[in-house]
């Protein structure tokens, strides 16, 4: 899903306040020119963008990517299809030479019986400058302070439950259209389960609804109303015309330990000779602070993100030493840091660029406990953001799966193995598969850490190794679990309806075997004070 530059956001959007310091970045006399960024020295793919028109009516994003990269040997840095079935797409490259080559190859090329038209595309205006030019002088965005939804808990749960009911009802209607043979079955289910295709159990939640997040990514920037350097949350997006950062003091789902850590590093940034990063001018250094926290182990990890700009290796080394000294001996020593990393976040030249991580001091990981088991959390490892509610989530998964000692649990896209390892004692064996080798290494360590002997983990893409891994199962009865988001599998239950429908399609060359039909669903609220909610749905065939 990162191919389409879409990010899952289960957290909140809020902001922070900071303090003015010397060495501020000055806005140039072209500050109101929305195209001034094209004249700067830093890389932007907008300089080398083309537009492809007359695309086929039916094609997939991955098909287009494969055509460009594999068949035509082009090297795009970004592919954007603004409108589904719109017949056109933008493609960006690293250089003028690569752009010219692409234009020559693509213009007049025939694909799926369509003759493509390729031409140079105009760069988009800087959205921040564009919005700023449109704002009246008295519309000060920094006067806003975004807070989380503070509805009563019962009101939040009722709202989420209603959204889930709507999604399941839509699923039932779409399933009948896709597989008319199931019409009678759907009507019977709806009469039995209050117009729903399956039983929907009451929404489950943790009693801890404030300060529950075990991971937060704080922005580092300037609060426009005070001029102070601040570690907190963006008040709005760049596209909305805001780069201001606001305070986290009143943000409900950030725990006190994280607030103390953020404020501590904020003091370091305010006293630093290096300025905060400017998203508009691409100057400055301090960009982000990621905080991870083990509630049950009281272990804290900090990941300091900065743009190194033109800093020498010696200057970076000195900066790293300053951070270490601050948290070990200076004012930051009151904040007990278990693990600290420095991350160099440079401007990405392609979607495959991964910011480099450098371990500064402490352990290379922290740990957290789920359902009594201990799990290692590396800096970039996925881990559910609400530890207390994750206990409830995993217990509910085990309940729905109906695991027994003659069942194989197939943990698809298992990550670091948390689900499978928590449920291992309820089944005969666990087989986990995951495309990221580092995650599989963590999963194996976690299995050893918890003395789990009936779990094996395999590296590979699900579509490539699922059949071979399933073939290893010792039992005829197999229960598969998949935890989105994955490519083609959204995490939002409203967007996942298509996947549900595909599971219930009639047997064909594409859809082999009998259809999977919904049996029971359980909502679990992992994200109080936000509109998001997890939905576990159990299908059988």
Go through each PLM region and give its residues.
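Rossmann-like S-adenosyl-L-methionine
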Residues: 3-18, 24-27, 55-71, 77, ...
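Internal alpha/beta scaffold segment
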Residues: 241-281, 285-287, 308-348
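Short beta-strand micro-motifs enriched in acidic
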Residues: 82, 206, 219-225, 292-296, ...
